[in-house]
């Protein structure tokens, strides 16, 4: 920060803590054993207090793996003193087949609208803030997923307009 850094992106920050009792999971995935644990909020609050929270000009964004709206609100509500905003991936799972992001199946437009609307309403209601995006290093490109080739130009403009008209901070990639 002394060298002029004005922002930090924390990759999968919501999985930096787990229960110490090491119970067995009740399902094959086990994400509930290490995702969004209460200690994660404690860690981020401490990091905020001791580092980036000392300066109002610092922006922080946390990438959230398999999270919930409730947790994104906690992570990004200024009253909680954790992060400025969060990335979530729920809207990008509308074309997954059996949980596989590289399946290239047609996306569910109605589900996409439902997810975007639900997250927008709930995050605003809870006082949180969202990082808005279509692309990142972990996902196939949005233009290939959500658009037909013959409408590439029009669809690109539509995708850009969509994230710029939602409540949150748009991130542009590729």
Where are these regions (language model features)?
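Active-site and adjacent substrate-binding regions of carbohydrate-active enzymes
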Residues: 1-174
